[in-house]
Regions:
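Extended alpha-helical targeting/anchoring segments
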Residues: 1-421
Length: 421
């Protein structure tokens, strides 16, 4: 049996992520075979159970509500293109290229089938080959695999310049723009995922096998968590690379903390998320708990804030998700206009990228990560996306370089993987 056939969903937590606790020990949640699955293109939903498929016309988030009410745990994603059904007045008007993935896609499990434990127990149980440590990874500038971006450097820089022009005109304050890359993948997707996680452990790593493709994510960003009547979001805006020495690393981190540009960018998204939460929360309950804190990962430092609010405990999951989707940190501000600008400037479909990935429980609690650092795998093929927030004083060349920085964990893991081929 291939390792990817043992579990259909695995959520890895380096600390205070999926498991929402303060444990420093990396942990996991995993599920074997789903009892039911459903996916949608727009509001045409396909439900599969016991080998039988049914197509119905309905809001997929209402289908999610229904199955949670029946006692299932749901693991999956809400894709970026579903924004057309959550953002009033927005409709895509440009043809896009690239693979079309379902807009909403969930696997449904009996809660009793969930297993959890420490990360080392998982890798031992899967009988994985020894995973190389980061220090043994290829660190040369030349990748050991052929990477195919969907835009040339010139095209990417021009896209950023056009985004800046909208900012200078006063249409928007910030916009997130991305590029897509495709690489060859010659090993089992789950083995690649664990190598990806080993390169850069994060709180919201996820592996979900939908059958015809696999979704892998190395996200470190909490989009939205509901725990009882409390909602929490941790928007990330502001990135810098790690230093080669401890001294340089400290200097780079200090520069990020004191950067007016990064603080302004972060604050804009904090204000956007406050507004989004306010539309579904109890009056006066929205508050900012943390502002401009820096989290450190193996390849970069990132600036993080936290917004919290209170909701009615009986509120439907679908109502909460509709009020805040898509994540503001990967769209921009104001949200509706930035969706229109992204639609105009980006040539590709985003799919699960910049959507929300996560787990929903029968009691209405859920945890959703922002769909960043994702890799979509099909036989022999890995597709991933990298992007960044553009503001009025962004340097297009530096923005391009930031996308390469953000892709390091994914490409380093591919270096290992394709060496094994």
């Amino acid at each position: 049996m291939k390792v990817s056939e043992k579990y259909s969903s695995i959520l890895l937590d380096s600390g205070n992520g999926w498991l929402s606790n303060d444990k420093a020990t990396p942990s996991y949640l995993a599920f074997t075979k789903p009892e039911i699955s459903f996916s949608s293109i727009g509001q045409e939903v396909t439900i599969k159970s016991q080998g039988i498929s049914n197509l119905i016309s309905v809001d997929p988030l209402e289908v999610l509500d229904d199955y949670l009410g029946q006692g299932y745990v749901a693991v999956g994603y809400i894709g970026y293109e579903y924004s057309e059904h959550t953002m009033e007045g927005f409709s895509s008007s440009h043809e896009k290229e690239g693979d079309k993935f379902p807009d909403v896609n969930f696997l449904l499990y009996d809660p009793e089938s969930m297993v959890s434990g420490e990360y080392e127990d998982l890798t031992s149980h899967l009988q994985m080959p020894e995973i190389k440590k980061e220090s043994s990874l290829n660190t040369s500038n030349e990748p050991q695999f052929h990477l195919c971006p969907n835009m040339s450097i010139c095209q990417y820089l021009n896209m950023v310049k056009k985004g800046k022009a909208y900012i200078e005109q006063g249409d928007i304050y910030q916009v997130n723009l991305s590029q897509r890359m495709i690489a060859q993948l010659r090993i089992d997707p789950l083995e690649y995922f664990l190598k990806f996680y080993n390169v850069q452990p994060v709180p919201f790593a996820s592996y979900i096998n939908f059958g015809d493709f696999q979704l892998l994510s190395g996200s470190m960003e909490l989009f939205l968590r509901k725990n009882g009547n409390k909602l929490t979001t941790n928007p990330i805006k502001g990135t810098t690379k790690r230093g080669r020495t401890a001294e340089i690393d400290t200097i780079l981190k200090a520069k990020l903390i004191s950067s007016e540009k990064e603080r302004a960018e972060n604050l804009m998204i904090v204000d956007l998320m406050r507004n989004d939460l306010g539309r579904v929360s109890l009056p006066g309950s929205v508050k900012v708990n943390k502002l401009f804190e820096v989290e450190t990962y193996s390849t970069l430092h990132q600036m993080v804030s936290e917004v919290e609010s209170q909701v009615d405990e009986n509120i439907q999951v679908s109502q909460v998700v509709r009020s805040v989707f898509p994540p503001g940190s990967v769209t921009g501000a104001p949200k509706k206009r930035t969706l229109e600008v992204i639609d105009e400037l980006e040539p590709h479909l985003r799919g699960p990228y910049c959507g929300a990935i996560g787990i929903f429980y029968p009691n209405g609690d859920f945890t959703l990560s922002v769909g960043i650092r994702i890799v979509l795998t099909k036989p022999g093929k890995a597709t991933f996306f990298v992007g960044g927030g553009i503001v009025w004083d962004s340097d297009p060349q530096k923005e391009f370089e930031e996308t390469l920085l953000k892709s390091q964990a994914m490409t380093k893991a591919m270096d290992i993987s394709n060496d094994a081929g």
